[in-house]
Amino acid sequence: MSIDKALFMDPPAQYRMNPMIHIWPEHDSRLFMEALKDYGFGGVVTNVYQEDGFTSNPKNLHRFSAIVQELEQSGLPYWVYDESGYPSGSGGGLVLREHPELEAKGLYMHRIITYTPREVRYRLDCESDRIVWAAKYQVDVSIPQDSIVRYETMQPVPFSDDSIRCELQACEVLYIFCQKPAYEGSHCTHNICSYDRYINVLNPDAVRRFIDLCYEPVEAAVPGVYAHAQAVFTDEPALQTFYVRPYEQWPYALLPWEARLPGIFRQMYGEDLYPLLPMLFEGTEVCWPARVKFYEMIGHVIGQSYTAQLRNWCRAHGGRFSGHYFGEEMLVDHVRSYGNMLSVQRQSDYPGMDILACWPEGYFPQDAKYVQMAARKCGSNGFMAEVCPFDNPEEFGKAPFDNLLATMGLNYISGVRTTQSYAEADFSAFGDGRFRDFLPRNQDMFGQVRKYFDRAQMRQLNAYVGRMGLLLDGLQNQCTTVLYFGIEDVQAKYTPKHDCEVGAQTIGCDLATLRLLRAMLDEGRDFLFADAEDLTEIARTGRLGGEEIRRILLPGLDVIRPEALAALRQLKKAGVCVLFAEKLPHIDALSGQQLQLAGEFEAVSVQEAVQIPDAQEAQFKTLSGPIVRQARYRTRDSKSMFFLLNPGRTESVVRLPGADARRCTVLDPFTGTITQERLNRDWTVPAVRGIFIIIEE
């Protein structure tokens, strides 16, 4: 791999960080763009002025047109942020104005059980829209102390929009399902930007109106703006049917809802959704397949209604659709926010994530690894990360320079290739100091501007990020080990709640996945996440991401998709090492069939699962200091390149066991130096930084 030393020392703008600039200096915007370049930034993320009507105000559009013209004249690439406030989709309230029917909706369940005959009368409350469905079922009380609903005895019950009158026999239960707006207690009411009500991301008409009001006017006012932009940045569109604060209890446990869902469910599965509704709220393991199917459908619908629709519009106007979604860190948030976040992310042109815990000890390593999987499925050159040191800013502020260095390395070793940043600089050192007090965003909407970095620090950070981006451009992590992405286990166990708690059973897959992931990282091992679709592909080709897969590790699951199990059986027979950590699954995710896998597969401890024989792959060993993370790549001229990253606070020493005296090129993205060395030596990896080693022979 031939490296241009001058290019490595001064990497191109496309690889450097882009600050989030929501507000520009009123009279000195062109000069401020020069300040951004002077501080080493590569471009910006910006938007139509968000106050005074957002895109409905011609003055805002005219001002944005002038900013875009100045950006193009200054040579600064730009991304277009698509919202006024947060989250994307509301248009600062424009979208729902005069169209309240497009608001996010949830379905709640009212349950009435009787053990003696009685008449039931029910009337809808003032917060709800209408009754959607009702049915009664027999209850089996033959087992002492239990009341088991017999779902096969379902009898629909007549109802009007707002009332029900029904005769219940002994040992019957009546389920009433009602629709209401999904707003109170949601992320709409607990964020730093607004209290706006929000659209239903399951409804393509709502998303179309968002396009009509917040995309079309921008293109009309600034023709070609989306074609000239790097991409659109959409910000955390999501369902609002779950609660986010532990100190709040609400009378409604909400299921995401939209009128088209029953028809889509029938198209996808050939089943009637209505009789399954009780199983989505409660019940034993017999209910798990209904939930897996429902939440898979939800992910599909959001992916098409929101992401694919916006992506297609952007493509039609010569642009790309990107941004990030809510709660990338935990699978339970993948389910309750999107049904299956992966189904939504993979519809992007360029997936993304955000990082809130921007210090190495607080960093969530699974976040980037999950999005890395989406980027691989999209076929994109990595993905975007929005760096937001908003989670515990006091901790970040203890050593902001080192913390951001470590965070950037952790991002890029996991697949990030573009960085948008809320880690702001102090621009006092530029020119006559006129930007000393300038704030690039509304602090009431986006939180306090803290100005962590001076000019020298920001130039160094931008150079470091730019050099990593230059070296990793177009390259993917080469891994022989995959970890299974067991989203179906969470889908099966998730039920709507009256508060923000999800329960130990529901979060079990998250915790099991993290135990396995952290054990891999503690061994210095790299890996890829793979879902059921990927396992099927590996069974067909033996490869994922161009690399032969030799080892498949599965976290402790109770539920597994049948196609995943079929692929695992085939791969095990072909000699691939398949290990279940902690326990074997026992439920088929789609049929509910009991699985008996003991004897066919082995459940081992987490530590046993991650012990990979050194002969299987080249692996640097940490001799002293913090464990060094590493990733291996194949360069464009087919050489092996290692990225060695030390996220710790002291230096580390590593060695490649069995290495010979082959020549290698060592690239330090912090200093910009390139040296020629021999491979058979000890290597020092500085604290919170990384180095690259290319084996030349």
Descriptions of predicted regions:
Residues 208-214:
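Conserved short secondary-structure elements within globular domains
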Residues 46-208:
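Acidic/aromatic-lined carbohydrate-recognition and catalytic surfaces
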Residues 39:
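Histidine- and aromatic-enriched segments that form or immediately flank copper-ligand environments
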Residues 7-22, 27-33, 42-49, 55-80, ...:
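Carbohydrate-binding surfaces of carbohydrate-active enzymes
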Residues 1-3:
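Basic/polar N-terminal segments that are highly enriched at the extreme N-terminus
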